[in-house]
Amino acid sequence: MCIRDRFEMYSAENAGLVKFDFLGLKTLTVIDKTQKLVNEKDPNFKIDKINYEDQKVYDLLSSGKTVGLFQLESSGMKDALMHMKPNRLEDIIALVALYRPGPMSNIPIYNDCKHGIKEPDYLHPKLEEILKPTYGVIIYQEQVMQIAQALSGFTAGEADILRRAMGKKKRAELEKQKQRFVEGAFKNGISKDIAAGIFLKIEPFAEYG
């Protein structure tokens, strides 16, 4: 059942409703028309069956020739692509997530670790599995939640509360969550100083997450 209302999002959320943002993108129309044009010569072509490991695509992206590509066509993004030289879909996803105020400063770190210039810093051995796909850089809210669970024994529900506290930028709630994080990590044999340092790494999500 779908409920539509005119209340602002926080009031709706407090009432137990979930807010969804639906974007109307011209890009989707372009993709649909492109597939139809291709189908005139190749009836078997389907956009959802394309090869995500096609190296020619990544070579093109790495050259910065991305005019008309949604989220990849700004001059800054072209420059970022040429420095990153992506060779897998995960790189593109990471770059789009990183290319905004705050996390943008982590792009050079991601690139250096990706290309073997420096070793990834996983912050703690328990976090290597979580951060290995992103070369030690915390990029996604899901990673923040997994870190809280792995280090501090948060339940999935508690980790989601931490995520929401960061997303809403509520300082009082964030301080409460920091205390819970540090104490939970200490119970798991991790010093409070190390735990507090790791929390400092994830705290910027309160600014841009």
Language-model segments: residues:
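Mg2+-dependent phosphoryl-transfer active-site scaffold
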Residues: 4-209
